[in-house]
């Protein structure tokens, strides 16, 4: 009977160790997935930042060109008078 108890405790111990190891691996996998998601989010933020900057520069250039065109039109109108 004593051998049976020891065997049973040993089997339960091995099962507990196995369960603990699998839980640890599961947490590591989740951490890796979270890290990959964070890296992808950073890439997206960087991309949106570049797009935003390019849009601002394009808007400034368009406004500058429109201002020059308006100034030229006014100068021509004044020059004709």
Swiss-Prot record:
Disulfide bonds: none
Acidic residues: compositionally biased ranges: 30-41
Gene Ontology BP annotations: innate immune response
Annotated spans, Disordered: 22-49
Keywords associated with the record: Amidation, Amphibian defense peptide, Antimicrobial, Cleavage on pair of basic residues, Immunity, Innate immunity, Secreted, Signal
GO cellular component terms, semicolon-separated: extracellular region
Propeptide: 23-45, 80-81
Family to which the UniProt record says this protein belongs: Belongs to the frog skin active peptide (FSAP) family. Dermaseptin subfamily.
Domain of life of the source: Eukaryota
Modified residues (Isoleucine amide): 78
Organism: Phyllomedusa sauvagei
Signal is among the record's keywords: yes
Name used for this protein in its record: Dermaseptin-S6
Compartment(s) of residence: Secreted
Any Pfam family hit: FSAP_sig_propep
Described function: Antimicrobial peptide.
Signal peptide per UniProt: 1-22
Tissue: Expressed by the skin glands.
């Amino acid at each position: 009977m004593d051998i049976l108890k020891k065997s049973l405790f040993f089997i339960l111990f091995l099962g507990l160790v196995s369960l603990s190891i699998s839980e640890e691996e599961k947490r590591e996998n989740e951490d890796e997935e979270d890290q990959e998601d964070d890296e992808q989010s950073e890439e997206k933020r960087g991309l949106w930042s570049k797009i935003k900057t390019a849009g601002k520069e394009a808007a400034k250039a368009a406004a500058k060109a429109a201002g020059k065109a308006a100034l030229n039109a006014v100068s021509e109108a004044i020059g004709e008078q």
